[in-house]
């Protein structure tokens, strides 16, 4: 956040616990907005997504929604794999952040427990790799 003070960060989605965390982040950093608490309905979310320079998301509905409004997506993949056919429509595969492990994908839909017990597919993803992909997308704008 401090490296890019001109950037605004909008947080989407989440259940009750996630919403509490997103509210705390929005209260802590003025550059962060909990969009899920501010917007009323899918149409408003799509409008906001269509104005983003980049959407950072896991393999989720938000990845697909951002894709539908032509927003570049940096997607984070753990148990699932984009080659299973769930990559966002018209998205650049190089923006899929993931680690290659012999146990991946362990679930087509991401709903099975980790067979290794260590969630290496997520824990081995470095924040720096995600930031690098974001910076690459922003430089292309």
Each language-model region and where it sits:
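Donor-binding and catalytic core of enzymes assembling or modifying cell-surface/extracellular glycoconjugates
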Residues: 1-79
């Amino acid at each position: 956040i401090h490296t890019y003070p001109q950037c605004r960060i909008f947080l989407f989605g989440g259940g009750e616990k996630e919403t509490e965390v997103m509210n705390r982040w929005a209260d802590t950093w003025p550059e962060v907005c909990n969009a899920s608490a501010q917007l009323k309905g899918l149409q408003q979310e799509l409008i906001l997504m269509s104005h983003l320079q980049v959407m950072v998301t896991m393999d989720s509905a938000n990845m697909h929604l951002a894709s539908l409004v032509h927003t570049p997506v940096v997607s984070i993949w753990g148990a699932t794999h984009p080659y299973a056919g769930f990559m966002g429509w018209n998205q650049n595969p190089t923006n899929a952040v993931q680690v290659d492990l012999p146990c991946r994908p362990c679930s087509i839909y991401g709903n099975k427990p980790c067979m290794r017990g260590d969630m290496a597919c997520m824990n081995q993803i470095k924040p720096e790799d995600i930031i690098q992909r974001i910076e690459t997308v922003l430089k292309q704008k």
